[in-house]
Amino acid sequence: MNRKSWFKKIDHIGIAVPSLADAIPMYEELLGIPVEHTEEVADQRVNTAFFSVGESHFELLEPTAEDSPIAKYLAKRRGGMHHMCVEVEDIDAVLAEYKRKGVRLIDEEARAGAHGKRVAFIHPAATGGVLLELSETPDSSED
């Protein structure tokens, strides 16, 4: 296969937590670095906290509604790794190609994510059990 990969890098690992107030100090101690950024992502009904680790990040996800995907995840698993996110150049092109190939998607169109990024999720049934998030950074052509 000679085509160039759509993936630029692993952007972050998403970790579901019941409480950012409890998790942030624990991760600051474990990682030896302060939290870099916190943000509410209303569309996904979560509060997030990011820690930079090289070119990638740990993203802590706290639900803000009982019916949010993170709340449902926590009800089954009490916490832990939720998803892996990869940065792509052109999320619309990647989604179009996956749809053409019949890849099972959670999001058929990109939506708003943290940091002003456009995101979409691929269903775990299409990835061997891993929830994979695609992320396009605004003005990513300037990287």
Tell what function each PLM region has.
Residues 1-6, 10-18, 49-52, 59, 71-97, ...:
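Vicinal oxygen chelate
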Residues 41-57:
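C-terminal "cap" of GNAT-fold acetyltransferases
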Residues 23-28, 51, 98:
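Conserved active-site tyrosine of GNAT-family acetyltransferases
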